[in-house]
A protein has these predicted regions:
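Structural alpha-helical scaffold elements that stabilize or flank donor/cofactor-binding regions
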Residues: 80-82, 128
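C-terminal alpha-helical cap of glycosyltransferases
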Residues: 171-186
Length: 186
């Protein structure tokens, strides 16, 4: 399992970044999720931190001794980590989940309703993703779904409902960016 983490800021970074109070909320939300995992389960998880904009995730996640942390500053792209995982959890609204949908790679999206807004442009697809248990806003529901998948991730991912959802994501979003470089990593 790889968790793709959000860049966290101590300062406001402009129109395309989350507000400063997002970082505190994000860390709290992630700890709620990570606290549910048993120590032996954490051994199979890599947390991929976003850029360090004044907040070092190691300062907050060092309590999880068995959690592997990969820093964005050390390796700029997480593609190889994703390719070596069975499933990715993307915990902020980035293009990663769109790229994974494009190549049909299993992922779960873990968003925060306060910061990741639903609009007329994304409401229908987000509701469909939530209905089909690809999108979660609650850490407990996400954890139980993930544990329930056990080693049947691909079986779940290939179900008709999931594949219809992925096709819908591709139809709505994936013609918006060039994924050729991303696909080469797999």
């Amino acid at each position: 399992i790889i968790i793709i983490g959000s860049p966290l800021r101590k300062y406001y970074g402009g129109a395309f970044s989350y507000s400063v109070d997002y970082s505190t909320s994000y860390i709290k939300r992630m700890k709620l999720l990570l606290n549910m995992f048993k120590e032996n389960e954490l051994k199979s998880i890599i947390y991929r931190s976003g850029w360090n904009f004044g907040i070092n995730i190691n300062d907050h996640f060092s309590i999880y001794k068995n959690l592997h942390i990969s820093k964005r500053e050390d390796v700029s792209h997480a593609f190889q980590l994703i390719a070596n995982s069975k499933i990715s959890i993307i915990n902020y609204n980035s293009t990663t989940w769109l790229q994974l949908a494009y190549i049909n790679f299993p992922f779960l999206l873990f968003l925060d309703k306060k910061y990741d807004l639903t609009t007329d442009l994304n409401r229908d697809i987000l509701e469909l993703m939530e209905k089909n248990k690809i999108l979660f806003y609650d850490s407990k529901k996400l954890y139980h779904h993930l544990i329930g998948l056990d080693n049947k991730i691909l079986k779940w991912w290939q179900t008709e409902d999931i594949q219809k959802t992925i096709k819908e994501i591709k139809y709505i979003f994936n013609n918006k960016f060039d994924t050729k470089e991303f696909v080469k990593s797999f």
